[in-house]
Amino acid sequence: MVKRESSTVAASTAATVAKAPAMPPPPPEPSALAIALAHLPFANGERLEYQVKYGFLGVGNATLEVLGLDSVRGAPAVHASFVVKGGIRIYRVNDSYESWFDPRSFSTLRAIQNIDEGKYDRQRDFEFFPNRTMLSENGKPETPTVADPLDEASFLFFLRSIPLEVGKTYEFARYFRPEKNPVRVIVERKDTIKVPAGKFNTIVVRPVIKTSGIFGEGGHAEIWFTDDSTRTLVQLKSSLKFGSLNLYLRNRRAGTAWDTAAASVAPAR
């Protein structure tokens, strides 16, 4: 009788255990790509629109835009652009910089530049191979570049991702032309400014690149980023050969969540 009762209890216990609901599987670990995208201060589809002034004259428009998540040679790439159009009769600027950069390393993988500043006019297409520190320009044989290269457009987005401490000068050997390095970024001060888009607390930086153009060493450029986690570029002033070319934020369209399915997660080649 005791053995029969023990068997009955054991069977009942086994049945209870068998009927217990299964524990759900743990959520998958986020990928390196998802983690990198989550830490970016800008989002998919962000569009910043600017009024361009040459001195005191309103003479054009500019945009800084995140066009989406793409793929370059199997590697994920943020596609972004910086476009400036404006000027006066004796000096006009019509610049377009497109960049595809890996959000995990902030390395440029591809860049297209159409630069028209005064009498300077050039179109260049670049393919970057960060793992080999090489680049190809306009389909020509490869030449050396730097580790984790950055072009002009990706450098603007890179500046939004780093700490900016007033009084410090940061140096980076990441401009894609090795002989033009280091790029110096001088954090000058904090400032409260008013632009068409509103009033902002900002951090003012001065980038210096050993090249011609808006950020060239021969001129003087300052950038006002918002003093918050987004580091939105709200104002840019650049002294050029024929005067000052200034950008003032007039409209901001916030971005949306990234869709990691839009790009491969292969390493950059």
Annotate each predicted stretch with a short phrase:
Residues 120-162:
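Hydrophobic, well-structured mid-protein blocks that either form specific transmembrane helices
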